Amino acid sequence: MSIKTDVLIIGSGIAGLFAALKISEYADVILVTKKNKAESNTNYAQGGIASVIDPNDSFEKHVEDTLIAGAGLCDKKAVESMVKEGPDRIKDLLEIGTNFTKKGNDFDLAKEGGHSMSRILHAKDLTGKEIERALINSVEAKENIKIYENAIAIDLLTEHNISGKSESLSNNKNCWGAYILDSSNGEVLKIIAKATVIATGGLGQVYLHTTNPLIATGDGFAMAYRAGVEIGNMEFIQFHPTSFYSTKTNSESDGHSFLISEAVRGFGGLLRTKDGNLFMENYDLRKELAPRDIVARAIDNELKKRGDDFVFLDLTHKNANEIVDHFPNIYSTCLKNGIDITKQFIPVVPAAHYACGGIVVDLNGHSSLSRLYACGEVTMTGVHGANRLASNSLLEALVYAYRCANSIKEFINNSSTNIPELLDWDDSGTLTYDEKVLITQSVREVKQTMWDYVGIVRSNLRLERAERRI
């Protein structure tokens, strides 16, 4: 079955939804999402979204903080674009009804690791969920946006799929949409579009321990790679220093670790070894407020040195009412797991959290393949370099989704709409449901291998072993 549209968007996180909203102002949109429309990495983002709001803050300071965190590998122009356009994109969120937490008449701006100023807008500790709510409401109100839920993108439509041709991937020059699996009935749709946007989010589920939901399996990276699209900086996987340590199995925990937000350390949380000793002063002068990569490596080193499974995050010295007010979700979730964070230390471990690399795009979200755009975590804009600054991810997604939408408008207005005859999906050589056990076992092996050998601290020996096993 073939369906035609102006723009196909793959993914329903902040990047995909915001791009859809803006593109709908001039074109018809089909948005496909792997599960339900609210299931995305955005929905699990707790801490907030960084932007220069405080009059005492400045673009220059935010840019500098981002460049420092990125370890000299950021694209300064990309960083400056994100930072300078950030306040306008925050206004866009406010206009569609996003409710950020306030202190009096002003926004309650938090400070997180690596930031020199308080510039994190948040909605308690459920920021991503609130942004997702506002975006979904706005998108659903648009008659020219059609959402397909439980629809899994399989592969991009390129020259390789032209009827009557047998092109190699190296000859791919255009993208005309994608093959989409309707998981409710097993049918594969061919969605043909003038422009396609990949906004599929991250790949944390490639690792044994991750803060990402089950859907974050790196589909967008893989599709682009198979189509010959340029990919970059994939070695830079950010590990969040503090995910909740649980003795539950992977299935019991729904396949991902509960995130203990960066904002908890910004609020004054202290890291302690299992015997109660503070240790961050041994690693960085900023202690608990050092960037994520430094804190994650410090915790990893302490765990390996002592043979422990976790360290503690301590909030017990802070006012109990303020803790509950600032972190209602973290408080209630930990309480369900037997930890009262106002009185007890929180057991935490690092977990795979964010991909700093991805599909290489320019400042307008255009990939190396004509008609193919990308935005959000699946991309390499150059903003994050080797390490993302806390709360820059939602900002980058917003700014570059907006730029992406503007670029597509110009492209559609000025380009030919001649689309070739494209082949229907051919499932020969694929596994059937009767052989699902083979897939399940392979997934387990990959996750364990990636965690053991391609984790926080790597060596040539470990990487070579991982390559052989995979």
PLM feature segments, named:
Residues 95-187, 199, 244-249:
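Conserved redox-cofactor binding core of oxidoreductases
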Residues 223, 229-340, 344, 398, ...:
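An anion/pyrophosphate-binding glycine-rich loop and adjacent beta-alpha core
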